[in-house]
Amino acid sequence: MNNQPILQVQEVTKAFGGVIAVNRVSLDVNEGEILGIIGPNGSGKTTLINCITGFIKMTSGKIFFRGKDITGKPVHKIADMGITRTFQIMRPYYSLPCYKNLVIPLFSPRAKRTGGWRGGGKLGDRDTVSIDILEEIGFERDSFVPYKLASTLPTGYLKRLELARCLAVKPEIIICDEIFSGLSMSEIASMVPLIERLQMDGITLIMIEHRLRELFRVSKRILVLNFGEKVIEGTPEEIMADEKVKEVYFGSEEVEEVMSHA
């Protein structure tokens, strides 16, 4: 790793008509870290990552990936650089078997160049690679689950399928939009070590999350947004101790509840 942030967001603003959803937000993401982004509903979290990933065009500002200006680049160009994401509302190909959901991204130019996740620069049989990835993120290889239609999967498996589709292209950054939402406590308990393992494998993660306890476990640096503006950036301990954050986001009772289980 070098000292330059892998991703730099500079003074990004996004306005929808007269409504400013994101207002001059700047942040640096260090290679290999897990950066958490939190804030109340409507605070601009998803809009910010939509700007980063090219899903919407920002009003002003700059975004750099490994020092290269990627401002205004289309979604497929940004994905080809290795910046991938999951969605709060999951978007699998519901009519296809799970493993076929991975075969499609394995046809991408990036997957062909890199060999896909664990590919070592050479892409093998796509069906086999798909099953290998699914097994690694928690699908039982010898069960029927990888071959089931995505439409039949419960939420826990769909969340893992979202991550698997990101891994298929051997990403450098995965942006997770509420990966813990809708999961049972046991599903969350098994998802946390998976996130930690992805970081150990060298992937940089940006996590938008409402499940604070779990986020604070995996992330050492948190950014708080409110009304489209950055409130504070710091460690989980600094975030929970900040009086302004308590007022605008948590409420003192919620902070105390999270702290008591930290």
Language model features with spans:
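Conserved ABC transporter NBD signature motif
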Residues: G61-K68, M81, L134, Y147
